[in-house]
Amino acid sequence: YRTIDRIYPALTREHKLLIPDIKGEAHIVYEEGRLYPHHNLYYITSEIWDLRALQAVLLSGIARLFVSVYSTKMHGGFLRFQAQYLRRIRVPNWSQVPAAVRQELITAGAKPDLAACNRAVFALYAMTAEERAALGGNGD
């Protein structure tokens, strides 16, 4: 018996975001380096972006928009949060994100509070009121 996917034991000790494949809403969990992601569980690591800030982006309406546009919708309205869809989400270069927006993203991701994540992402992408409304919020 052997797995299809290659096992990287060092990944266990890395901080990462864990994302289940099939979910109704984005369910992005910060993992501090104690668990290994197994089947149907995607992971994201980053040496550049703060993972809590990235968690806020992935919990926001913008991530759901990207995934819902590209993903196959499963029975019951569930979306597949697969790697190929998550890769389509464009994030700015972390070094170009203003310090105040960085902190807002990190704080929102750490809670995690969907409304706070959306507000931080609205600021990150400098979204208009119309764009914010399309994603389900006004940023207030």
UniProtKB/Swiss-Prot annotation:
Catalytic activity line of the entry: a 2'-deoxyadenosine in DNA + S-adenosyl-L-methionine = an N(6)-methyl-2'-deoxyadenosine in DNA + S-adenosyl-L-homocysteine + H(+)
EC number(s) recorded for this UniProt protein: 2.1.1.72
EC main group: transferase
Keyword Methyltransferase: yes
Keywords, alphabetical: DNA-binding, Methyltransferase, Restriction system, S-adenosyl-L-methionine, Transferase
Recorded GO MF terms: DNA binding; site-specific DNA-methyltransferase (adenine-specific) activity
GO biological process: DNA restriction-modification system; methylation
Family statement drawn from the similarity comment of this UniProt entry: Belongs to the N(4)/N(6)-methyltransferase family.
UniProt-recorded name of the protein: Type II methyltransferase M.AbrI
Species of provenance: Azospirillum brasilense
Taxonomic path: Bacteria, Pseudomonadati, Pseudomonadota, Alphaproteobacteria, Rhodospirillales
Gene behind this protein: abrIM
